[in-house]
């Protein structure tokens, strides 16, 4: 049926949600980050909607604002969507930490999940190997193509991996050239993996640390 065909071609399994945690690296354990900042590990998961505001449809598009409260830490988080006439959606996330005494934020961004076939990665940013804000001078800006399965680096202990910095845009496509394109309003960092941060940092695997 037409409905099932549309579903099969829908690339997004889990739409963007807030992301505050990354799998700790070896240095983080020396700094006790997993313990000191552990409240951020699940802060994205326990939340409730406080208010939804739908704006007027104008020449910029249709805006939808969702005000959340992060239940575990009682902090407001806002996601705004601007749906434009050309089919693109601008997604913006913001958090208000005014007056809080929370620990250092390991990461601020969003995460989403795609269906499995979108294995072909192309991006314009620093590469071709993983790079981070504190180690990227050897990774030059360019256009890179690779498979998602190659973005994971086999460290001795599973940890944060695969990040790319100064990225202007990226695409994840299937064998037929269908998929998604993500463009930053400013240079962004991203990782595209077959693993979630939880997979790389299972709390119960203390014997690996």
What are the language-model segments listed below?
Residues 1-209:
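Beta-strand/loop-rich accessory regions of lumenal/periplasmic or secreted enzymes
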């Amino acid at each position: 049926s037409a409905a099932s065909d549309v579903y099969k071609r829908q690339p997004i399994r889990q739409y963007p949600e807030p992301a505050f945690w990354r799998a700790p690296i070896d240095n983080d354990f020396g700094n006790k980050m997993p313990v000191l900042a552990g409240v951020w590990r699940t802060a994205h998961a326990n939340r409730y909607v406080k208010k939804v505001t739908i704006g007027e449809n104008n020449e910029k598009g249709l805006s939808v604002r969702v005000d959340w409260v992060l239940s575990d830490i009682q902090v407001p988080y806002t996601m705004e969507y601007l749906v434009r006439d050309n089919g693109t959606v601008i997604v913006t996330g913001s958090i208000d930490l005014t007056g809080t005494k929370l620990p250092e934020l390991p990461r601020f961004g969003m995460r989403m999940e795609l269906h499995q076939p979108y294995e072909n990665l192309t991006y314009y940013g620093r590469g071709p190997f993983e790079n981070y804000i504190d180690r990227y001078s050897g990774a030059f800006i360019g256009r890179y193509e690779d498979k998602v399965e190659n973005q994971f680096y086999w460290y001795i202990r599973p940890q944060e991996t695969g990040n790319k910095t100064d990225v202007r845009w990226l695409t994840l496509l299937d064998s037929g050239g269908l998929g998604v394109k993500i463009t930053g309003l400013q240079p962004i960092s991203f990782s595209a993996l077959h693993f979630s941060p939880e997979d790389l940092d299972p709390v119960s695997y203390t014997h690996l640390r």
